[in-house]
Swiss-Prot record:
Similarity section: Belongs to the CDP-archaeol synthase family.
Name used for this protein in its record: CDP-archaeol synthase
Pathway: Membrane lipid metabolism; glycerophospholipid metabolism
Keyword entries, A-Z: Cell membrane, Lipid biosynthesis, Lipid metabolism, Magnesium, Membrane, Phospholipid biosynthesis, Phospholipid metabolism, Transferase, Transmembrane, Transmembrane helix
EC number(s) reported in the record: 2.7.7.67
Tagged with keyword Zinc: no
Organism of provenance: Natronomonas pharaonis (strain ATCC 35678 / DSM 2160 / CIP 103997 / JCM 8858 / NBRC 14720 / NCIMB 2260 / Gabara) (Halobacterium pharaonis)
Topology within the bilayer: Multi-pass membrane protein
Any one GO molecular function term: CDP-2,3-bis-(O-geranylgeranyl)-sn-glycerol synthase activity
Amino acid sequence: MVAETVAIAVWAMLPAYVPNNVAVLAGGGRPIDGGRTLDKLTDEDGVLYDENRILGDGKTWRGTAFGTAAGVVLALLLNQLQPFVAGTVGVPQFPIAAAVALAFGAMLGDILASFLKRRTGRQRGAAFPGVDQLDFVIVSLALTAIVATGWFLATFTLPVLVAIFVLTPVLHVSTNGLAYAFGLKDEPW
């Protein structure tokens, strides 16, 4: 039972787990924020926001596009494998809306985390415990719940969600450590 729950959790989240890794490999190019800062904006009291970049150089249009595309393509490939796996483990097929929501939601979660990092004075690559490990999960799940509600409710049962929130930080730290060891990342987190 636990093994099947873990298998379903990993399978269902693969389209969200892959995009940020692909973005690291395919990134570069024009930053989403265009190099802009928030220094020209003020709050209702006229106090200037910080002068940090909105997102930073690590969030690019190319990385976002390639990451999202990779997650969607992976979901479509998993759909082809699902009939062979479903006899052993009850893994789901991915409707296109769920595939896009999982993949793009993962990228959006990472972008939002970058925004939060800049607002809290953290530079690119600085650790942000908790946020670094779960940002993409929370946003991808939320977006999927909105655009593919029936599939989300059928797939992400409470035990599957628990498995995701327990496994993801471990997987995140492990894969980032490997990427760092292979010189693909400047920091091991």
